[in-house]
Every structure is written in structure tokens, then in C-alpha cells.
């Protein structure tokens, strides 16, 4: 087998780059043990804008946390990529490749907004295309259920957006656990939901309320008895957001 | 070719600003079919003694005392002898501190009636964004708006400035100001500026909490932690890794931590909306270390960063005049009975119909 830094050098060619996230580069790669199987490598490069001490600490912590969470979830019923291999020192994680679109892109396609919501202006009053409503609803309810299962496993994602849920054969798979952590606290789960709500509002502004309703419908269907406390906290977090004094 | 003139009044926090702007329209059908001239931009800041913040009542009194003189100076400098020739009076309708906003809107209503000129209420945040776009020439950037009361990551979509990320509790400028109060760092010209100067001499990095939640962030925990360190420093027993920590080290560590968080959420928003440009606005935006860090991040994404200097970053009247005039040219006017100010006025409430 080739050593990892060498491997990375071979990988890090532009043609292998699948995505440039906020803090990681995702390359398609060969599985380290099963050469016929395709997988991806998530690499956290050094961030020269921040202090080396802080950067090293964050990269190591997040790579480890992501791997731990993926490993924990591998035994449960939440759909996440399989963890293949980790090299925390070099900030590398090998994992299963999920084929499909992100929910963000899929919704934009469904809405007929191919160039991307945040970059394009459109008419404000457009209604949802009739034929697509049921597939949008079904999918978002499923996404909500997946998030519910995640919280039921006491995992908080930390960055729930429609970019971080993929659709594989129409079934949602949650990805990118770089900011994830283990928590049983209703407060942490509520902040997770608040982040999701805000991301939907900004990314899919025209029908955000409807989309959130569907997500929560799915979420509430699976979380069970812990839901009361989480939803109550969510109300608190929303208030905090709204009340924030806005001077300046 | 048509020209339009607007006078803007800003007083949502401790700066009182009045500015006059001129738009010369060459192509009325194009979004960018006009040029902008800044005829005057006058500001007076209410400065409190070290260790104290500015209270609404005292700030409002400062604005009342100065507003007439500042308006006169702005008109003189703009060489406007007949103010009835102005096309609109723009004023900050919110968000901000209640009492200071109130005292300035009274001035706005008065001159509008004296001169028979329509009023236009402006959202403070939109004022910052529009001024930043105009000065830097950034066309469709992700905007990081950082000031004493606001911390937001914004991108334009479908006629609104959408908030992608923001603070879940206190603003970054508030965090810096309150830290400055503990160490009695002077408030002139601004606490943030003095922290920036001290931070340049800091060497030892003291680890602080790092709390990013997706595109949002939280800073109250960082503040509490660094305040407790500052108090230990004042008591003379702050040693980390065998190193005697100085006030400079604390300023340095606080800046590095907060700004790393800000750059990270901005980068996350850029990745999320596929944008290559960043624009930094708001008072904290004139911090050169923040601009430098943002520049490194943008460069690594093959993008670019746009920032302005203190004339436009720090609250000013010209940005209000500018955003007000953009709205007025679309036929927007705030009727006298609708000119109440509001402390809470979300950036995404404004219909941005001057952009496509």
C-alpha cells in the first residue's frame, strides 16, 4: 500500500476534486484495501489565515470528531457514509462515496431554478409547480426523519443545511460531520434545528416556510418523547435570535 | 443625464453622521447606469471614559446637541445653498438604540417639513451593504457585516439581502468593547482600534473557546472566558505554559480567535452559495488583521476580498443618503406618519428593488 502523504499527492489533482467545502477538499479516490471500490477522501488543508496553533488544534479535533461520529452512527439506522480509514495527523478521512445530488441542488432543480438560488434573482410570487409538490414533500419529510433519527442517537450535526444532505436513489444521506458532536442536551439539538431552519430560509427563500413545516413533520414523527423539551428550547433559541439587540 | 441629491442622517449608536450624496444617472434602465459623488460626509462620535460604555440617554443627548451643527456643516461642505433642491432626506429607521434613533429622526422630520422634501427611512444594515458595494465595485459579494451590534453573513437573492449566518447571542464589536472595558482600554477613537494596536504587540496565544455552529457563531462564552482571564491578569496571576501573559497577548488571542470564527463562517457561506467575492462592512470591518485574514481565505478560493476604510466602514451619514436615494429613485417614500424608528429591523425585511 502507498503511504498517505504520497497518496494525497497523487490524489490532489484538479481532476479528482469533487468539492471544495468551507474547510475541506473532497477528492475521489481508490479504496485503500479494495481497489475495485470507489471512495472519497476528505482532506482538511492547513488554513493559513488562522494561527498555526489554533489551526492544528481545530483540524485534528474535527477530523477525529467526524470519524468518531461516523463510527458511532455506522451501527445505527441513520443513513451516513461508511467510514473507511482515518489519518487524523494529516487531516485525512476516507469514506464511502455517495452518488447523487445534494438536497439543495435537487430542490433548485425541482423549482426550475438551475443557476442557484442565492446567485439569481427571480420573481417573488411564484408558486410551487403542482406536479412536484408531492415529491418535494415526500423527500423533505424523509430528510426530517433522518435528522430525527440522528438526534435520537444523541448526535448533533453542527451544520445542518440542504448542502449537507445528499439524495441517493431518492433517500436522504446526511454528510459532513466536521462540526458534529455527541450531546444529549435539548439545547444543543435545538440550536441544530435553528441552524437548519435559518439555512432553509436563506437558501430556499420563496417556499422556506412550507419546506420547514415538512422537515419538522418528519422530525417530530421519529423523535418521540424527547421532542417536547427540544421544541421548547427551539422556541427559546428563536427568541434569542430575534431579540438580539441590533445596534451598530 | 439627470442628477439626484440626498441628505442622509445616521444616529443608531454612538456616531452621529450626516452626508450628502449625488447620483448622476446616465442610463435609467441599467442597474449600474449611474455614477456616485460624495459631496460631504461629516461624523461626530460620542466618546465615553475608559471602562464605560455609552448609555442610550446620554448618547441621545449628544446627538441632539450636535445634529443642527453637523447638518449645517454637511450642507456647507456640499456647497448646497438651497436645501429645498434636495430630492430626499434619508434617515436611519433601525436597527439601533431607541433613544439615539429617536433624537435623529426628529431632526429628519423637522428639516423635511422646513424644506418640503420627502423622507426615506433606511435600514442601517442595507446602508452599509450598498455603500460597500458602491465604493469597492463588488458586484454580488457575500457580505460580512460586523459591528458593535451586528454580526451577519449576508448574500443577495431574489430582491432581498438574505441572512445566511449570524451571531446567536452578542455581536463581535460588543464582545471587543466589553473586553476593553474590563482592561480599561480607552474608547477614543474606538475600543476596537486600540485593541487592534495592542494585539500587534501580542505574541503568546492563549487558547479561548471556539464556538462555530455551521454558518452561525456564538461569542458570549468567549467573552465570559476572556473576561475572567483579564481579571486574573489584573490580579497579577495569569501564567499560561510558564509564560507571564500580558494585556497585549490577551488582545491578540481574542482577535485571532474571533476573527478565525468570522472568516470560517464567511467561507462556509461562500461555499454554500458558490460565490467568489467577499465584502466586509461595519465598524469592525476596518480592522486590518480581519481584512488580511479574509484576504488569505479568499485567495485560497481564487476569490477576492473587498473592504473599505474608516470613512465608510464606521457608521456614517453618506451610506444612509445613498441607500435612501436608491430606494427613492424606485418610487419609495416614507410618509410622515410612518417614520417611527424601530430597534429591531431585520436586514431581510427590506425589498431591494433597485437590484435585478
Swiss-Prot record, chain A:
Superkingdom of the organism of origin: Eukaryota
One GO CC term on file: EKC/KEOPS complex
Molecular function GO labels: ATP binding; ATP hydrolysis activity; protein serine kinase activity; protein serine/threonine kinase activity
Principal subcellular localization: cytoplasm
Example of a GO biological process term: tRNA processing
Chain residues that bind ATP: 18-26, 42
Active site: 159 (proton acceptor)
Pfam families: APH
Residue ranges of the TM segments: none
Subcellular location: Cytoplasm; Nucleus; Chromosome, Telomere
PROSITE patterns: PROTEIN_KINASE_DOM, PROTEIN_KINASE_TYR
Catalytic function, reaction form: L-seryl-[protein] + ATP = O-phospho-L-seryl-[protein] + ADP + H(+); L-threonyl-[protein] + ATP = O-phospho-L-threonyl-[protein] + ADP + H(+)
Occurrences of domain Protein kinase (ranges): 12-248
Segments of this protein annotated with the region Disordered: 113-132
Binding partners and assembly: Component of the EKC/KEOPS complex composed of at least BUD32, CGI121, GON7, KAE1 and PCC1; the whole complex dimerizes.
Stated role: Component of the EKC/KEOPS complex that is required for the formation of a threonylcarbamoyl group on adenosine at position 37 (t(6)A37) in tRNAs that read codons beginning with adenine. The complex is probably involved in the transfer of the threonylcarbamoyl moiety of threonylcarbamoyl-AMP (TC-AMP) to the N6 group of A37. BUD32 has ATPase activity in the context of the EKC/KEOPS complex and likely plays a supporting role to the catalytic subunit KAE1. The EKC/KEOPS complex also promotes both telomere uncapping and telomere elongation.
Domain-level remarks: This protein is considered an atypical serine/threonine kinase, because it lacks the conventional structural elements necessary for the substrate recognition as well as a lysine residue that in all other serine/threonine kinases participates in the catalytic event. BUD32 has protein kinase activity in vitro, but in the context of the EKC/KEOPS complex, the catalytic subunit KAE1 switches the activity of BUD32 from kinase into ATPase.
Family: Belongs to the protein kinase superfamily. BUD32 family.
Protein name, entry field: EKC/KEOPS complex subunit BUD32
Species in which this protein is naturally found: Yarrowia lipolytica (strain CLIB 122 / E 150) (Yeast)
Lineage of origin: Eukaryota, Fungi, Dikarya, Ascomycota, Saccharomycotina
UniProtKB/Swiss-Prot annotation, chain B:
Compartments it resides in: Cytoplasm; Nucleus
Residues reported in the UniProt entry to bind a divalent metal cation: 124, 128, 145, 315
Cofactor(s) listed: a divalent metal cation
EC numbers, comma separated: 2.3.1.234
PROSITE patterns, A to Z: GLYCOPROTEASE
Entry's Gene Ontology cellular component terms: chromatin; cytoplasm; EKC/KEOPS complex; nucleus
Keyword Disulfide bond among record annotations: no
GO terms (BP aspect): positive regulation of transcription by RNA polymerase II; telomere maintenance via recombination; tRNA threonylcarbamoyladenosine modification
Domain of life per record: Eukaryota
GO-annotated molecular function: chromatin DNA binding; metal ion binding; N(6)-L-threonylcarbamoyladenine synthase activity; nucleotidase activity
Main location: cytoplasm
Keyword terms: Activator, Acyltransferase, Cytoplasm, Metal-binding, Nucleus, Transcription, Transcription regulation, Transferase, tRNA processing
Binding site for substrate: 145-149, 177, 192, 196, 287
Reactions that this protein is recorded to catalyse: L-threonylcarbamoyladenylate + adenosine(37) in tRNA = N(6)-L-threonylcarbamoyladenosine(37) in tRNA + AMP + H(+)
Co-factor: note: Binds 1 divalent metal cation per subunit.
Family designation: Belongs to the KAE1 / TsaD family.
Stated role: Component of the EKC/KEOPS complex that is required for the formation of a threonylcarbamoyl group on adenosine at position 37 (t(6)A37) in tRNAs that read codons beginning with adenine. The complex is probably involved in the transfer of the threonylcarbamoyl moiety of threonylcarbamoyl-AMP (TC-AMP) to the N6 group of A37. KAE1 likely plays a direct catalytic role in this reaction, but requires other protein(s) of the complex to fulfill this activity. The EKC/KEOPS complex also promotes both telomere uncapping and telomere elongation.
Subunit description: Component of the EKC/KEOPS complex composed of at least BUD32, CGI121, GON7, KAE1 and PCC1; the whole complex dimerizes.
Protein name as it appears in the record: tRNA N6-adenosine threonylcarbamoyltransferase
Source organism of this protein record: Yarrowia lipolytica (strain CLIB 122 / E 150) (Yeast)
Amino acid at each position: 500500500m502507498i503511504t498517505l502523504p504520497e497518496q494525497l499527492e497523487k490524489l490532489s489533482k484538479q481532476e479528482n476534486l469533487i468539492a471544495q467545502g468551507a474547510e475541506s477538499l473532497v477528492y475521489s479516490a481508490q479504496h485503500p484495501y479494495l481497489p475495485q471500490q470507489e471512495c472519497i477522501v476528505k482532506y482538511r488543508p492547513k488554513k493559513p489565515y488562522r494561527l498555526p496553533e489554533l489551526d492544528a488544534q481545530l483540524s485534528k479535533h474535527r477530523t477525529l470528531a467526524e470519524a468518531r461520529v461516523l463510527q458511532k452512527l455506522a451501527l445505527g439506522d441513520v443513513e451516513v457514509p461508511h467510514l473507511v480509514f482515518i489519518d487524523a495527523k494529516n487531516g485525512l478521512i476516507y469514506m464511502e462515496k455517495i452518488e447523487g445530488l445534494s438536497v439543495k441542488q435537487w430542490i433548485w432543480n425541482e423549482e426550475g431554478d438551475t443557476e442557484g438560488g442565492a446567485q439569481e434573482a427571480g420573481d417573488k410570487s411564484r408558486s410551487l409547480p403542482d406536479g412536484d409538490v408531492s415529491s418535494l414533500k415526500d423527500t423533505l419529510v424523509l430528510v426530517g426523519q433522518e435528522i430525527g433519527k440522528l438526534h435520537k442517537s444523541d448526535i448533533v450535526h453542527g451544520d445542518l443545511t440542504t448542502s449537507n444532505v445528499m439524495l441517493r436513489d431518492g433517500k436522504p444521506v446526511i454528510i459532513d460531520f466536521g462540526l458534529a458532536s455527541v450531546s444529549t442536551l435539548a439545547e444543543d439539538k435545538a440550536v441544530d434545528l435553528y441552524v437548519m431552519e435559518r439555512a432553509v430560509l436563506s437558501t430556499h427563500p420563496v417556499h422556506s416556510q412550507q419546506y420547514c413545516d415538512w422537515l419538522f413533520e418528519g422530525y417530530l414523527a421519529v423523535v418521540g418523547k424527547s421532542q417536547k423539551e427540544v421544541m421548547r428550547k427551539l422556541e427559546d433559541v428563536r427568541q434569542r435570535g430575534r431579540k438580539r439587540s441590533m445596534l451598530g | 443625464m439627470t442628477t439626484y441629491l440626498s441628505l442622509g442622517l445616521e444616529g443608531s449608536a454612538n456616531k452621529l453622521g450626516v452626508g450628502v450624496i449625488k447620483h448622476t444617472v446616465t442610463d435609467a434602465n441599467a442597474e449600474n447606469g449611474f455614477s456616485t459623488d460624495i459631496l460631504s460626509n461629516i461624523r461626530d462620535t460620542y466618546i465615553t471614559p475608559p471602562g464605560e460604555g455609552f448609555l442610550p440617554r446620554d448618547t441621545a443627548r449628544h446627538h441632539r446637541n450636535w445634529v443642527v451643527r453637523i447638518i449645517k456643516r454637511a450642507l456647507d461642505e456640499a456647497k448646497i445653498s438651497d436645501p429645498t433642491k434636495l430630492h430626499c432626506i434619508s434617515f436611519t429607521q433601525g436597527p439601533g438604540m431607541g433613544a439615539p434613533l429617536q433624537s435623529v429622526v426628529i431632526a429628519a422630520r423637522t428639516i423635511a417639513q422646513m424644506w418640503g422634501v420627502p423622507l426615506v427611512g433606511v435600514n442601517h444594515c442595507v446602508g452599509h451593504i450598498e455603500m460597500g458595494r458602491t465604493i469597492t465595485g463588488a458586484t454580488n459579494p457575500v457580505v460580512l457585516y460586523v459591528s458593535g451590534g451586528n454580526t451577519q453573513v449576508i448574500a443577495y437573492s431574489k430582491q432581498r439581502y438574505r441572512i445566511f449566518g449570524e451571531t446567536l447571542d452578542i455581536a463581535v464589536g460588543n464582545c471587543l468593547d466589553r473586553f476593553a472595558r474590563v482592561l480599561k482600554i480607552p474608547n477614543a477613537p474606538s475600543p476596537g482600534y486600540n485593541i487592534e494596536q495592542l494585539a500587534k504587540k501580542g505574541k503568546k496565544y492563549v487558547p479561548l473557546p471556539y464556538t462555530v455552529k455551521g454558518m452561525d457563531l456564538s461569542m458570549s462564552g468567549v467573552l465570559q472566558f476572556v473576561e475572567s482571564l483579564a481579571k486574573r491578569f489584573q490580579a497579577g496571576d495569569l501564567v499560561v505554559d510558564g509564560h507571564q501573559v500580558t494585556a497585549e497577548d490577551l488582545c491578540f488571542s481574542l482577535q485571532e480567535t474571533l476573527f478565525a470564527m468570522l472568516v470560517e463562517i464567511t467561507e462556509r457561506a461562500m461555499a454554500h452559495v458558490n460565490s467568489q467575492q467577499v465584502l466586509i462592512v461595519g465598524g469592525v470591518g476596518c480592522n486590518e488583521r480581519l481584512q488580511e485574514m479574509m484576504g488569505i481565505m479568499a485567495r485560497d478560493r481564487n476569490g477576492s476580498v473587498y473592504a473599505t476604510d474608516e470613512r465608510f466602514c464606521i457608521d456614517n451619514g453618506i451610506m444612509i443618503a445613498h441607500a435612501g436615494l436608491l430606494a427613492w429613485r424606485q418610487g419609495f417614500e416614507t410618509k410622515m406618519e410612518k417614520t417611527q424608528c424601530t430597534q429591531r429591523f431585520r436586514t431581510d425585511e427590506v425589498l431591494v428593488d433597485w437590484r435585478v
